[in-house]
């Protein structure tokens, strides 16, 4: 494929935009470098770049675009609302309608508030939990990404009894001292942290199904024990469902797994492609938030009518019969095809799949923990990524990320993807 115009625009972008990208994950640093492809438009399962190349897209904006690009129903809703106004700074009926649809789908959201991103949603749930418990420390699990606010950019200490250290320049040590990081799926480490820190722990922050070191399910009983241990300690359980809400079924992962948190943060998919975030949970906890309580959260753009309208339209698409069954079927076809090719070419790789989402890891281990992904073969992934890209398959440029199917992918797309993977693997021996 020819990428000359992307390369020219990336050079121009470097003159005006820091690093040439507005989010570091868009660079190709993790896959050996080079100019990232500059996209021009998207329709359904496909993206088209500035050089005229067409791609089958499995990045899907890192997850939000579950109905494909420029879905007609959602696009029409956005256009209609834009003609009526995009921001009023007042309540609208759309906020009520969208909140009701969300609570009908996720019953634990007894009360809801909207913000503008997943980062804001998680940041605010932590504040609310601290206000409710009158404690300061939180526990999170290694490898899970909860946005770019200071409190969650903290690396693990040497064990559950050790405090974290800043995972980014600009995060104060004083903030890092409020965070304990333990391995996901390691209930003994979680018990040790709770026993050591006791009544200092306000909340534990959990991705019920991990989406940020690939797709990783909780081990049987893990989430149930986290709930039990937390509540016996007076610690709240916060689920970060920014990736998982409406990803696997019409609702949240918590309902699929049958384990209910005290608070939930959500975002990505529910905005229909527009910026959105939100949080909700038990009414008595949510009543800590202003104007009813002392925990302050506000936002000029929060609950804006354009995002509300897009979210309503998105849910109208997802609540139709057969949507998630199709995603699961296509995901199964993709997984089975890749596994056959891995065996055919004697590639060291494994796959985690959850319905219409999967991750290909260049390792010989079944992945259940972050450390396994960290030690997987990044060089092999980088080579695979570029071999696929040059055949018109767009993946996330990181070994830690997932492939996302949409309602608009087809069996023919899967066949073309497997044909490309067959060639890519043949070049990796």
From Swiss-Prot:
Keywords: Cytoplasm, Isomerase, Porphyrin biosynthesis, Pyridoxal phosphate. This is Glutamate-1-semialdehyde 2,1-aminomutase 2. Coiled coil: none annotated. One of its GO terms (cellular component) is cytoplasm. The modification N6-(pyridoxal phosphate)lysine is found at residue 268. Belongs to the class-III pyridoxal-phosphate-dependent aminotransferase family. HemL subfamily. Pathway: Porphyrin-containing compound metabolism; protoporphyrin-IX biosynthesis; 5-aminolevulinate from L-glutamyl-tRNA(Glu): step 2/2. GO terms for molecular function: glutamate-1-semialdehyde 2,1-aminomutase activity; pyridoxal phosphate binding; transaminase activity. Homodimer. PANTHER family: GLUTAMATE-1-SEMIALDEHYDE 2,1-AMINOMUTASE, GLUTAMATE-1-SEMIALDEHYDE 2,1-AMINOMUTASE 2. It comes from the Bacteria.
